From Swiss-Prot:
Gene Ontology CC terms, in alphabetical order: cytoplasm
InterPro entries found in the cross-reference section: G_OBG, GTP-bd, GTP-bd_Obg/CgtA, GTP-bd_prot_GTP1/OBG_C_sf, GTP1-OBG_CS, GTP1_OBG_dom, GTP1_OBG_dom_sf, OBG_GTPase
Localization per Swiss-Prot or TrEMBL: Cytoplasm
Quaternary data: Monomer.
Catalytic activity, EC: 3.6.5.-
Binding site for GTP: 167-174, 192-196, 214-217, 284-287, 319-321
Similarity field: Belongs to the TRAFAC class OBG-HflX-like GTPase superfamily. OBG GTPase family.
The encoding gene: obg
PROSITE patterns in alphabetical order: G_OBG (PS51710), GTP1_OBG (PS00905), OBG (PS51883), OCT (PS51881)
Cofactor(s) needed by this chain: Mg(2+)
GO terms (BP aspect): ribosome biogenesis
Record's protein name: GTPase Obg
PANTHER family xref list: DEVELOPMENTALLY REGULATED GTP-BINDING PROTEIN-RELATED, MITOCHONDRIAL RIBOSOME-ASSOCIATED GTPASE 2
Amino acid sequence: MSMFLDTAKISVQAGRGGDGMVAFRREKYVPNGGPWGGDGGKGGSVIFRVNEGLRTLMDFRYNRKFKAKSGEKGMTKGMHGRGAEDLIVFVPQGTTVRDAETGKVITDLVEHGQEVVIAKGGRGGRGNIRFATPRNPAPEIAENGEPGEERQLELELKILADVGLVGFPSVGKSTLLSVVSSAKPKIGAYHFTTIVPNLGMVRTKSGDSFAMADLPGLIEGASQGVGLGTQFLRHIERTRVILHVIDMSASEGRDPYEDYVSINNELETYNLRLMERPQIIVANKMDMPEAQENLKAFKKKLAAQYDEFDDLPMIFPISSLAHQGLENLLEATAELLAKTDEFLLYDESDLVDEEAYYGFAEAEKEFEITRDDDATWVLSGEKLERLFVMTNMERDESIMKFARQLRGMGVDEALRERGAKDGDLVRIGKFEFEFVD
């Protein structure tokens, strides 16, 4: 039996863009033959793709770092470098992807074949053909490739099931699933026999079919982490109908109605509108002594909690072991599913806006100036750092171009206002230069 894993932490890094090239062709009467260096290729992106054949995040237990390839460098004759292939990472249906740093949901992957770009590959650097002007027909300038995006992610799998079985341990959830579907969950006469969710396809006599999940037993305090805690409550979130299984024989010495109230309290505490999902009460083990009397007492207590105009939850007496009452239960479940819409786990405010996620929604801060203990001025900022890493510091013309870009951004003036003097050291990353006033 394969291990089940429903959470994982991974890192993804898109490929860097290829560097642009400085090259010249040989042609009579053309300065230096004219520029002939091509652009670098685009870096590969990291893309998540849903594969309905996957049932767990187990693959991410052993492989936690995903890095796409970089684009090729530009070439002579103005030829562009080859762009790198995107890295496709397969995930199971029902995978929620969060940014580990912010906790924000990036995407919720539920459809087979659905794809989302998780980290964008860097743009290829421009070759010197791109920088030719009438004033400078033979530029010795080319850009380095742009770094690819890199981020830490949290993956969370919430299995896709139409119907979820909830209840205390050993109330018969696994037995019920095993007799109404082809699923083969582990069944035992002890608590927490089921320690992973089990999924089975159910087909009714009338031809309706739906997916049913047997979830590990809940106990009081599960929403605060008691027992198996919230690690399996998450799997209830995608269900449309809840079958609340209760041991009506009270074989564990608990009161069936108190079990019902306790489990509902846990669902409500966990939140995410779980109590908005329609419930069917499954009175199991009705073939056992005292079950009929317990059911009468249960119905009386339940009715006392509702107004006369409220609709009481449906109750179906069954015995999974004796295969009694199952047909009526399944037909009613299918009918309820047919008129119950899906529940959205995340509204638009929960999801990271795609434009904001990729840094285009609002104007980014161009630069920031701080001062180290050694009196060195330190420049930082997304735009400034991106320009820096794409500048070829081995060529004088590229350095001069970068200096003009800084001046155009107002860096020189800002340094003067902060008190920078001629000859002061300025640092960007690990690169240092002297401030010239």
